[in-house]
Amino acid sequence: MAAGGGRAFAWQVFPPMPTCRVYGTVAHQDGHLLVLGGCGRAGLPLDTAETLDMGSHTWLALAPLPTARAGAAAVVLGKQVLVVGGVDEVQSPVAAVEAFLADEGRWERRATLPQAAMGVATVERDGMVYALGGMGPDTAPQAQVLVYEPRRDCWLSLPSMPTPCYGASTFLHGNKIYVLGGRQGKLPVTAFEAFDLETRTWTRHPSLPSRRAFAGCAMAEGSVFSLGGLQQPGPHNFYSRPHFVNTVEMFDLEHGSWTKLPRSLRMRDKRADFVVGSLGGNIVAIGGLGNQPCPLASVESFSLARRRWEVLPAMPTARCSCSSLQAGPRLFVIGGVAQGPSQAVEALCLRDGV
């Protein structure tokens, strides 16, 4: 499917992971795709660590994680990959922070989080790691904001988020970290807030127009997008239970307001728990769950220039609950759930002259 200007999307299929998994933690470092932890077929967190050499297309086993975990956050710091939080074998959030030293092929423990947490959002800026929110062992959402200083191996507290949450989407834009959505228990959060890294202050922006769980979020060209998800019942709709939607809501950072796009500009497929990203001026939505009895393979893109949705080549392996990672012109879709935990590793690529 053409993307304009002689560019097109295509899928690149990589060798499957040796270990099938869902909720794995992924990182891209020096031409290698690292997949760490996650849940396997038994439904328990793994300590398995594997890396795909992007040049030779071969998988290698790495030293196992000191702490088996799923749903952790990962940040690349030069030759190190920092793994933060997550959930352990007894389904309890962990405080453990560990660093994989790529040149030495081994793990080192780092200063732990002040509180155990899963669903922590992390952002790297100028060699510092910012950790926002999370859910603690008491299942309460957290508002904590921390910064990790690698040289001192310590976490420092910053002003708390106005809205506690876990599993939020975060975007670094200029000198601000934008935090969108997330959850409080089973309830989706509509808050949209920004932390100024220079003044270390929070700004509340207008909330999402609609309350949706498992929506997909992306930032592109000065706008933030919130797509699809499970619409929650409320006083302004006729549904008594959550239902899949194809909603598209866009926040313009310059004007500071949300726009709910009309029906003609909604996604073609209603979906939730899917992968979303930005490639070459297009917002892409991949896979997920919809009204069908099995995960979706469908893929579509919204062109910011032409303001319309287009159908893209289907994902080779239909999946939901995937890990994802963007590296240059590739959006990787890793693991997830098909019939069970998946080994699939595929990347949607934007190519010139295809």
From Swiss-Prot:
InterPro entries: Kelch-typ_b-propeller, Kelch_1, Kelch_domain_containing_8. The keyword Protease does not apply. One of its GO terms (biological process) is nuclear chromosome segregation. It comes from the Eukaryota. SUPFAM superfamilies: Kelch motif. It is found in: Cytoplasm; Midbody. Pfam families: Kelch_1, Kelch_KLHDC2_KLHL20_DRC7. The keyword Nucleotide-binding does not apply. Kelch repeats lie at residues 1-31, 32-79, 81-127, 128-175, 176-222, 224-281, 282-329, 331-354. Transmembrane segments: none annotated. GO terms for cellular component: cellularization cleavage furrow; cytoplasm; cytosol; intercellular bridge; midbody. Keywords: Cell cycle, Cell division, Cytoplasm, Kelch repeat, Repeat. Involved in pinching off the separated nuclei at the cleavage furrow and in cytokinesis. Required for mitotic integrity and maintenance of chromosomal stability. Protects cells against mitotic errors, centrosomal amplification, micronucleus formation and aneuploidy. Plays a key role of midbody function involving abscission of the daughter cells during cytokinesis and appropriate chromosomal and nuclear segregation into the daughter cells. This is Kelch domain-containing protein 8B. It comes from Mus musculus. The gene is Klhdc8b.
